[in-house]
Curated annotation (Swiss-Prot):
GO terms for biological process: lipid A biosynthetic process; lipopolysaccharide biosynthetic process; response to antibiotic; symbiont-mediated evasion of host innate immune response. It comes from Helicobacter pylori (strain J99 / ATCC 700824) (Campylobacter pylori J99). Pathway: Bacterial outer membrane biogenesis; LPS lipid A biosynthesis. SUPFAM superfamilies: Acid phosphatase/Vanadium-dependent haloperoxidase. Gene3D superfamilies: Phosphatidic acid phosphatase type 2/haloperoxidase. It is a multi-pass membrane protein. This is Lipid A 1-phosphatase.
Length: 191
């Protein structure tokens, strides 16, 4: 029986290279969300059933799979990578929310939620669903987990429809999750 060495597996989990495409796409989404003045979406009286279902149930599927798949495959390195990316995403999202709360760009306060609350930018829900889907696609297989891709825009639309975030905030949130995957995840060796 192999001895599990925590420090060794942690060091193995640190990526040797980065996906330049994923990093460029994520930084582009963050900059787009922060600097483009998207129009305010009018308040909705009702939320479509698909978005209600996504907000309360479906958005958890990628997050559960991002932990379950490494466990099922006994992929300790993948488990460390999803943990590192999740911790980094949570920290980066909440630090950015506080840093941008009182920043105004194009006569729009980035921290102002559509209903008047604070800590709008970036969306934590969008960052976590983006992280989970991007992790599964980068670590294991784009083709195998392509079916999860629609959950990203559905989660983003649900947050907008529920008047919880602006369009820019959900785009920046998606970029934040993808950025952390790009920095902390490498494809699994098929050997």
């Amino acid at each position: 029986m192999k001895k599990f060495l925590f420090k060794q597996k942690f060091c193995e989990s640190l990526p040797k290279s980065f996906s330049k495409t994923l990093l460029a796409l994520s930084l582009g989404l963050i900059l787009l969300g922060v600097f483009i003045p998207f129009p305010k979406v009018p308040k909705h009286q009702s939320v479509p059933l698909a978005l209600h279902f996504t907000e309360h149930y479906a958005r958890f599927i990628p997050t559960i799979l991002s932990v379950a798949i490494p466990l099922i495959q006994r992929d300790a390195v993948g488990l460390f990578q999803v943990a590192n990316a999740s911790i980094a995403t949570t920290f980066l999202t909440h630090a950015t929310k506080r840093a941008l709360n009182h920043v105004t760009i194009n006569d729009q306060r980035l921290g102002e939620r559509p209903y008047g609350g604070n800590f709008n930018m970036p969306s934590g829900h969008s960052s976590m669903v983006g992280l989970a889907v991007a992790f599964l696609m980068r670590r294991y297989s784009v083709k195998k987990y392509l079916w999860l891709l629609p959950l990203i825009p559905l989660t983003m639309l649900a947050r907008i429809y529920l008047d919880m975030h602006t369009i820019g905030a959900v785009l920046a949130g998606l970029g934040t999750g993808m950025l952390c995957v790009g920095l902390f995840t490498s494809p699994k060796n098929l050997n």
